[in-house]
From Swiss-Prot:
Transmembrane segments: none
InterPro entries noted in UniProt: UPF0637, UPF0637_domain_sf
Top-level taxon: Bacteria
Identification of the protein by name: UPF0637 protein BPUM_1363
Record family assignment: Belongs to the UPF0637 family.
Length: 211
């Protein structure tokens, strides 16, 4: 099995100055691991969701000035893209690795999914583990811990996805850099698999909704 766990030098990619310079290092150092993670987890996600999952590695092609502060591989049930669909992500900032179920702002039907989550609020609050986190913007590293959100705060998150055009909803885990570099490959992959098996619960809600 190829090495997929991120090392210190992978995280250090995001300290390289300049768009071209950082992208060169990212392509050489980080992208091969993202591609390997994609190949490893696409069959698992296909199996546990019942949808054939396709791999999409972030290319950052639209960037012309500012270098990326994070990068990722996404999994969605379409070859054509993932941003408009409920999807899964594995990626990293210079401080941590993230594993997400994601509804991001490009989704034309995220409002309908937000309504569905609001209806299932009590169940979701009980099912999501206390050490999981929520995000309302995939472009920022800030998160809200599930253990610190009461029902009203969670409801506000779900309502925001319905009413705010740029609103997003992501749920999953963050693994601190310091922990990741101490893991072996198997431990790292096991953490990701456990997270995916948990957030698939949210993905299944979107499968039930005909939108």
């Amino acid at each position: 099995m190829s090495e997929m766990r991120f090392r210190d030098e992978d995280f250090e990619t995001f300290t390289v100055d300049g768009l071209d310079e950082r992208m060169t290092v990212l392509k050489e150092r980080v992208r091969p691991k993202l591609e390997a993670l994609g190949e490893h987890f696409a069959p698992l996600l296909s199996s546990i969701t019942g949808d054939e999952m396709f791999v999409h590695v972030a290319k950052h092609a639209r960037r012309s000035v500012n270098p990326p502060n994070d990068t990722w591989v996404a999994f969605a049930n379409s070859k054509r893209g993932y941003k408009k669909l409920p999807h899964f992500q594995i990626g990293l900032w210079k401080t941590h690795v993230f594993v997400w179920f994601a509804l991001i702002y490009e989704s034309p039907v995220k409002g309908e999914y937000g309504q569905l989550f609001e209806k299932e609020l009590d169940t979701i609050q009980k099912k999501i583990p206390q050490d999981f986190v929520w995000s309302k913007d995939h472009m920022k590293p800030d998160v809200m811990r599930h253990s610190e959100l009461d029902a009203e705060q969670l409801k506000t998150l779900f309502e925001r996805v319905q009413t705010v055009k740029k609103a997003e909803l992501l749920c999953g885990i963050q693994l601190p850099r310091e922990e990741v570099v101490q893991m072996n490959n198997e431990e790292f992959l096991s953490k990701i698999e456990d997270a995916f098996r948990t957030v698939t619960y949210l993905y299944r809600f979107t499968q039930k909704q005909s939108v």
